[in-house]
Amino acid sequence: MKTSLQIIKFGGTSVGSGERIRHVANIIAHKLHDPGEAFPIVVVSAMSGVTDQLLRIARYACTGAHQDCEFELSALKQKHTEAAEKALHNHESRHSLLHDLETAFTSLTQDIHELQGTQTRELPLRTAAVAAWGERFSVLLVAAAAREIGIEAAHVYEEVIVTAYPQSETLQPLGTVIGADPLTEETRANVQRLIHPLIERRVVPVVPGFIGRTTTGFVTTLGRNGSDYSATVIGAALDCSEVSIYTDVDGVLSADPRIVANTRLLPQLSYAEAARLSWFGAKVLHPRTLIPIAHRNIPVRVRNTFRPHTRGTVVGPEKTQRSAAAAISVRHQLALITVENTDMFGAPENAGQVFALAARAGAAPVAICSSSGHHLSFMVEEQAASSVVALLQHDMGTWRVICQRGLAACACIGSGFSADPMSPARAIIALAHEHIPVITQGASEPGIILIIEDQDSERALRCLHRDLIAPVIPLVRHEARERKREAR
């Protein structure tokens, strides 16, 4: 009989210390021994802050700041040594883990030395090789902690599960990470070769998130915060029954709890709702996380590592019953670009031309606000606005280009928003009561988008949540609210 499988992925805060790594090992043990649970495959992030440390090390190595590089590397090694000493209590187990970490740091040092003499074109891949070590250190720690409490666990360390497209020729700023795209069939073959033999022996695989390897053999990465993405890529390749993302909140909340009091915990979301929330600024899921699993109807559950008994939020296929509202998120530092044909006549293909020019400038439209034969308005990241405007003015002939900066997109997401024709009016009235002007609005199935001044965004988030979300979603206790109360 085919074994039912699940992915359990732990983020950087979940493995942020030796004590937390022991706690993660106990969660793995519960999953393994509970007859109601599928067999677990563990995916881990780097310890909190480690990827940034590695990118600093890479930058120092490239710029010749050798003393700073050595200082950061020493601090990084100390961090993992301390985590190992607290995660493992058995002397022999700890000694073996420290030896494995020492070997890993020797390999990292070699990658740093190779980076120092790298030509400009090879910098992104050499930097990725350094940035990838955080997850590799984590799998050593988590697998060792699991073994110490009696779990048969093996780290998949030397080989990389996810195969990705080769990096493009486009140069990236120093200190950024590559966002490579996985190759489905090649990754599935890697899973069959590296993970299935462990599962057949009832050995729990512990694999690194974030990391890929190109078809040409270079280590690459799946983009900033890409461990969630790699978890669902591997989950799809294994045909898992569920992917659980363990983080430091109880699930997906109805708004940012740092700004809005009495946020609601959302028990479920559709794939479309979660994807739009992520696109418009919600931080719980990586924007690309749902791509590999949505067409397979594999649910994702967002759970709290530190309150593992809570059910969290399930993200899955479209709900049969539409909700009146789900959540509100804000994307900051945007610009509104309007392109107008001064003679009032335009061709349908002009929209395609505009977006092609925006893509050449390195900008993907965040939202489309209005479109007609002679008029098109869309939002882009503010930092890309000048390049987009320059290209449009150069290539669009008689078309007039207008740019308004300092804006934010306030996204009211939920299937009920798009089903209720009065939702936009209620949202605009709520903002009007707070004297917050709406610059323009757009549609984002499922939901509505309101463009406002960025300086008004926090007030807008509070009043929209108060008037649109709070009346229709019950208030329940969740961890974010309890932490806020304890901090008072």
Annotated model-derived regions:
Residues R296-T310, H332:
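Active-site C-terminal subdomain of aminotransferase-like
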Residues E242-Y246, V300-V302, V366-A367, T440:
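Short hydrophobic alpha-helical runs that function as membrane-insertion/retention elements
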Residues R311-R488:
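A conserved regulatory-domain signal marking ACT and ACT-like small-molecule sensing domains
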Residues I293:
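Acidic-aromatic/histidine active-site loop/patch
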Residues I151, C240-S241, I298, A363, ...:
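Short glycine/serine/threonine/alanine-rich loop segments
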Residues G150-H155, S244, R301-V302, T310, ...:
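Proline-centered turn/helix-capping motifs that create local helix->coil transitions or kinks
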Residues M1-L285, L290, E381, I451-E453, ...:
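Nucleotide/pyrophosphate-binding catalytic subdomain
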